[in-house]
Structures are given as structure tokens and as C-alpha cells.
Design a protein with these regions (language model features):
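Cysteine-centered catalytic environments shared across enzyme families
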Residues: 1-237
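ATP-dependent adenylate-handling active sites, centered on carboxylate activation for C-N bond formation
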Residues: 55-58, 137-399, 412-427, 436-442
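A generic structural-conservation signal
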Residues: 70, 234, 356, 404-405
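A short alpha-helix-loop-beta-strand transition element characteristic
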Residues: 401-409
Length: 443
């Protein structure tokens, strides 16, 4: 007589954590179970979902937040644990008496833009099947920067419109603001939306981190706001360099990539300061995903990349090399699908509800439609100058607002002084990775 497998699913993500703007959570789960995965694209907002139909389980997430799972073995069959954090999975396994099966490298990240299907059939567990639900057409816009800019900023403004519409008018809105292109575009688009709705811009604040008196971002932010006449929105959050703890950031984001650790470290300092000043503040927008969309990363810093690979590979910076590639990490995913934790995890640590409009499919689709190869003609310099032109022209055509354009600078470089950066960062990635593993050994 064949033994009947009894599978359990332990979902640690409450429905209240879903930020779906246009349907109930159960309706979104129904789309996840439908035959055509493209239906998941109808879900507006931020989500990390699981749906079950017998032995079949499907998972999907938006690009702005993580979704992880672990398959444990029980006497009667497999147990699937689903959470947005590795330590939550570890703790759940320990409570269920399966702590000995856990290792952080055995956890799996659901890759963004895919439906992940798992069959709970018991030992041996089959590999998951990935079915893409977001596949925007590439390079379909004309090589006209005015048209490109207008298309891209219209998509940005639509995401901001949907976000603002879902938040009670009494709730204040903040932007994590450096004066750079992406946070600047979000601030101007949000300011424009509030005016269009007949609401006071006093509801809005631009928060800038200043470590040890301020790095280059503080001066840049002040110049940006001065040139746009929005000085009244500015709030500076002061923090000492001693408060920057990259090892604490490793624990929060559960990753060890140096650039993400550095970004999360300064992000934690900024969010901590906002929370101390405003105990009840919830809603914060940021510019995360803007660099990925318009491919504004220095290719020279990555020996694995060429300009051809950057402009010719679909959503390279959003997804990494893709789920079919050898280099794709099962534990972490790739690209912003992995790096989303640098913003999401710190925000959740301090009780904020984060919003990254550049990470939404509507905006990414507008970016993927840009004919990058035709526009750049193999030139790094043209590629690096493209984002400023696209955003500046687009914001002017859509909102009538003039976007100040400054040279690119990473958040962790602009928020701190050079001396503070040298003192707090620059450790070898092995140190961060070892620290992450040690956290689970202690657990």
C-alpha cells in the first residue's frame, strides 16, 4: 500500500502586510493559481504572495520586496515555510522541532517577475518551475529623448498617483532625498500630484541624511530645493558616524554584498532619525530602482560587464543574469530582485511602509522600451548621460517642473564625509558573509 503524503504550508506573511492597491488579497491569489501567469501583472502595488491548490504551490512577489521559502521534511511529508526573512524561517523551524534541518544557504528566494511553482510531493523534492509573468517589449520607442522622457515620467506619475490615492489624506508623505536624479524626480512628481489633487504640499517632506555635519548630498539637496523653490519641504536628519554599523546592516538585510550593506547602513541611520523625530510616520517614497531602469551604473567597476551586455540583456540590473543562468543565486536571486532588501528591510525594521515607484512594472516597461543600443552607439559616456536627459525632459513635458541635474553619486558616498566613509566601510565581503553566518550559528 502506497503511503499518502501529507504536506503542510506555513505562511508567515500576514495578509495585512500586502499592499495591493486594486483588489483583495484572495483575488490576487486566484490570479496566481490561474493557468496564464501573465494575470499576476494585473496586481497593482507591493506584494509577496503564496497560493495553494492541493500539492501545487505557487509564489510570486513584486520587485520591491523579498519572498523566501524553505522545504523541511516531516514524518508524513514536506513542510513548506514561507517568509520575507531568513531568520523568521529559522525561528519557525525551531518552533516546529526542525531546527536541525536549517541552514541559511538552504533557503530560497522567489525571483521577481516570475511565478514560482513547487510540487509538495515529498522526497525527493522536485526543482521549482519558474514561469515569467512580466516580459515587456524592448526597444519599441523611437530614439527621441522628448518622447522617451514623456513616456517614462508619465509611467512614474501614474504609479505615484495610485500610491497617493490609497493613503488617507491626513497621513504625511516623505521622500528619502539626496537631491539626485531619482529621489529628485520622485519628489517633484509627488509634489505635482498633490497640487493636482488640490492638496497642500505641507503634507510632504524631503528627508536628507547628514552624517558628522553632512556629506556632499546635503549641499546638493539644498541647491536642488533652492532651484525648485521647495526649500520649505526640507528636513535634515543628523547622525554621528559612530552610528553607522555595517554589521548591524548585514543582520537587517540578511545579505553581504558590500554596496548593498553600505547603502543599508546609511539608510538605517536616516530611518532611525526620522522615527525618533516622528514616532507615528508611516509612508516613505524613494528613488530605488531608477539606476537599474536607465542602466546608470559604472560598467568599469564590474569586470563581468560590457556596454553590449548591459544594453542587450533584458532587465539585467533588475533581475541579474536570469533564472536560467549558471550565476543565478537560488538563495538570493540577482540584480535588484536581490538588492531590494537594502531599502525594504531597513524600512520595515523601523515600522515604515516603503514605496519605490521606479521598481513597478509600468515604469520598468517604459524603460525597457527605450532603444538604448541605438541611442548610445557603444559609448559609456552617452549611456551615463542618458538618465539626466530622460528625466529632465520628461518632468518638464509632464509636470512643467524643471529637474536640476547633478553628477551621479551613490547614497552611501553622498551622505557621509570621505573620512567617515573610509573609517566605517571598505571591509572585505568575506567579513560581512562570515558575520551573516555567525548570526545563525548563535541562533
Amino acid at each position: 500500500m502506497r503511503h499518502q503524503t501529507i504536506a503542510r504550508v506555513l505562511n508567515l506573511i500576514p495578509d495585512e502586510d500586502q499592499q495591493i492597491l486594486n483588489m483583495a488579497v484572495d483575488d490576487a491569489r486566484a490570479l496566481l493559481l490561474a493557468e496564464n501567469p501573465a494575470g499576476v501583472l494585473r496586481i497593482e502595488g507591493s506584494f509577496a504572495l503564496i497560493a495553494r491548490d492541493g500539492q501545487r504551490v505557487r509564489l510570486a512577489r513584486s520587485l520591491d520586496r523579498p519572498l523566501r521559502y524553505f522545504l523541511a521534511k516531516e514524518k508524513d511529508g514536506p513542510m513548506l515555510v514561507v517568509a520575507d526573512r531568513i531568520d523568521q524561517i529559522r525561528d519557525a523551524l525551531e518552533r516546529e522541532g526542525h531546527g536541525g534541518q536549517f541552514h541559511p544557504s538552504y533557503t530560497r528566494m522567489v525571483p521577481a517577475h516570475h511565478v514560482t511553482e513547487i510540487q509538495l510531493v515529498g522526497c525527493p523534492d522536485p526543482n521549482p518551475v519558474y514561469r515569467r509573468f512580466f516580459d515587456p517589449p524592448r526597444e519599441v520607442l523611437p530614439p527621441d529623448l522628448d518622447v522617451i522622457g514623456e513616456t517614462y515620467v508619465q509611467a512614474l506619475c501614474e504609479e505615484i498617483r495610485l500610491w497617493v490615492a490609497a493613503i488617507p489624506e491626513r497621513e504625511p508623505l516623505g521622500v528619502l532625498f539626496s537631491g539626485g536624479l531619482d529621489s529628485g524626480a520622485v519628489l517633484l512628481a509627488l509634489y505635482h500630484e498633490l497640487l493636482a489633487r488640490g492638496q497642500s504640499p505641507a503634507r510632504l517632506k524631503a528627508f536628507t541624511l547628514a552624517v558628522d555635519g553632512g556629506g556632499a548630498d546635503l549641499e546638493q539637496a539644498r541647491e536642488f530645493l533652492g532651484r525648485t523653490g521647495l526649500q520649505m519641504l526640507h528636513e535634515v536628519i543628523e547622525a554621528p558616524s559612530a552610528a553607522l554599523d555595517p554589521f548591524a546592516a548585514v543582520a537587517v538585510i540578511e545579505d553581504y554584498k558590500p554596496l548593498d550593506v553600505e547603502c543599508a547602513t546609511v539608510n538605517l541611520a536616516l530611518l532611525r532619525g526620522i522615527r525618533e523625530r516622528y514616532p507615528d510616520w508611516r509612508h516613505l517614497a524613494d528613488g530605488d530602482g531608477g539606476d537599474e531602469n536607465l542602466k546608470d551604473y559604472p560598467i568599469e567597476e564590474n569586470p563581468e560587464l560590457t556596454i553590449r551586455s548591459v544594453v542587450n540583456n533584458r532587465m539585467l540590473y533588475q533581475e541579474g543574469w536570469g533564472v536560467e543562468a549558471i550565476k543565478h543565486s537560488l538563495t538570493y536571486s540577482g540584480g535588484l530582485s536581490r538588492g531590494c532588501v537594502r531599502g525594504y528591510a531597513p524600512a520595515r525594521r523601523y515600522g515604515f511602509s516603503p514605496f519605490s515607484p521606479f521598481s513597478r512594472p509600468r515604469v520598468i516597461a517604459a524603460a525597457e522600451a527605450i532603444p538604448f543600443a541605438e541611442l548610445t552607439r557603444g559609448s559609456h559616456e552617452i549611456l551615463y548621460g542618458l538618465k539626466g536627459e530622460v528625466l529632465r525632459r520628461g518632468l518638464w513635458r509632464v509636470t512643467g517642473l524643471d529637474l536640476p541635474v547633478f553628477p551621479k553619486r551613490r547614497f552611501q558616498h553622498g551622505a557621509v564625509t570621505r573620512e567617515a566613509f573610509r573609517n566605517q566601510f571598505g571591509l572585505h565581503p568575506v567579513r560581512y558573509r562570515s558575520h551573516l553566518l555567525s548570526l545563525h550559528q548563535q541562533g
